[in-house]
Each structure stands twice: as structure tokens, then as C-alpha cells.
Amino acid sequence: DEEVGCFPNVCKNDGNCSIETSTGMTRCQCLEGYTGHVCENPL
């Protein structure tokens, strides 16, 4: 399975993109100091 949801990486500010296997949705693991669905919000 190709993880098309992460190419290109939708996460902002160098967040780490991964695919939720149960839903097929992308999720972002944000670097420290950022929050939001795609790490778009500085803390």
C-alpha cells in the first residue's frame, strides 16, 4: 500500500506524517512547539 496521503508531506513545520491504518486518514506528529492537525499552530 502506498501512503499517498503523506506524499507530499501535508504536515507543516517539519511535522512527521503517518497514516492511521484504521481510518486511512493522515495524522501529523508535531515537533515540540507546534500543535494543530497539520502542526500549523505555534504553541
Curated annotation (Swiss-Prot):
GO molecular function, a single term: toxin activity
Q: Name one GO cellular component term.
A: extracellular region
InterPro entries cross-referenced by the UniProt entry: EGF-like_dom
Record's keyword annotation contains Secreted: yes
The chain's coiled-coil residues are none
UniProt-recorded name of the protein: Augerpeptide hhe9.2
**In which compartments does the protein localize?**
Secreted
Disulfide pairs? 6-28, 11-30, 17-39
Its domain of life reads: Eukaryota
Question: Which Pfam families does the annotation name?
Answer: EGF (PF00008)
Provide the tissue specificity: Expressed by the venom duct.
Q: Which SUPFAM superfamilies match?
A: EGF/Laminin
Which part of the chain is the EGF-like domain? Answer: 2-40
| Chief site of localization | secreted
Q: Which UniProt keywords apply?
A: Disulfide bond, Secreted, Toxin
What's the domain remark here?
Answer: The cysteine framework is IX (C-C-C-C-C-C).
